[in-house]
Amino acid sequence: MNTLPVKQSQLINPIAAPEVPQELQENIILTSLNDVYSWCRLSSLWPLMYGTACCFIEFAAMIGSRFDFDRFGLVPRCSPRQADLLITAGTITMKMAPALVKLYEQMPEPKYVIAMGACTITGGMFSTDSPTAVRGVDKLIPVDIYLPGCPPRPEAIMDAIVKLRKKIGNEHLDERGQLQQTHRFHSVKHGMKSVAPILTGEYLAAPTRQAPPQQLAEALGLPLPALEAIEKEAVERN
């Protein structure tokens, strides 16, 4: 007598953890998209070095074989459109401020800034009597890591990069837009007195500047208004 096989019941969503074959247990990594995104960014920071003073000389030792700047995945770039890290080292003056802001605006998001040296952070020794030094680069662009020193050692630069990598690793994709830094320029006064402009154009508009000197005009044979008036009177009398 032939009997039909009894179909055993099977749970669609079992409580127990699914079994992974042995050949796949060592080839699967479980992670989140946010962790992969942060890992890719912190392992490939491409800096744009904006050196203006003696602090930038420390990068010569940083790039050398003793400290090996490239082992952190840092590849210096010449174009701001290819960089995601801006390192400012040295004094920032009023004349250079627009260029620095333009470089920062040309960098793609997400982008980070390391302020290196006392002159970049507070103006340094130029903060007391210099009429052109900016008292802190954070009044122009937002800063993520402050690196004090005059100048900072290469070990301090490495520590700043490690701290920046930790900050990038703790960021979340959904919170990136809510963690934008506030611009300190709107809340902190620059502390500089406004001075009336020296070149107002009045000197060039003076009557003595409208006509060449008499000696020069006589040497070149140019007609002088005074001589023309005397000659005109002589002609009228005759």
Curated annotation (Swiss-Prot):
Keywords assigned by UniProt, alphabetized: 4Fe-4S, Iron, Iron-sulfur, Membrane, Metal-binding, NAD, NADP, Plastoquinone, Quinone, Thylakoid, Translocase, Transport
Domain of life of the organism encoding this protein: Bacteria
Enzyme Commission no: 7.1.1.-
Cofactor remark: Binds 1 [4Fe-4S] cluster.
InterPro entries reported for this sequence: NADH_UbQ_OxRdtase-like_20kDa, NADH_UQ_OxRdtase_20Kd_su
Membrane topology: Peripheral membrane protein
Signal peptide: none
Biological processes per GO annotation: aerobic respiration; electron transport coupled proton transport; photosynthesis, light reaction
Binding site for [4Fe-4S] cluster: C54, C55, C119, C150
GO molecular function, one term: NADH dehydrogenase (ubiquinone) activity
UniProt family annotation: Belongs to the complex I 20 kDa subunit family.
Subunit architecture: NDH-1 can be composed of about 15 different subunits; different subcomplexes with different compositions have been identified which probably have different functions.
Protein name per UniProt: NAD(P)H-quinone oxidoreductase subunit K 1
Organism field: Cyanothece sp. (strain PCC 7425 / ATCC 29141)
Gene for this chain: ndhK1
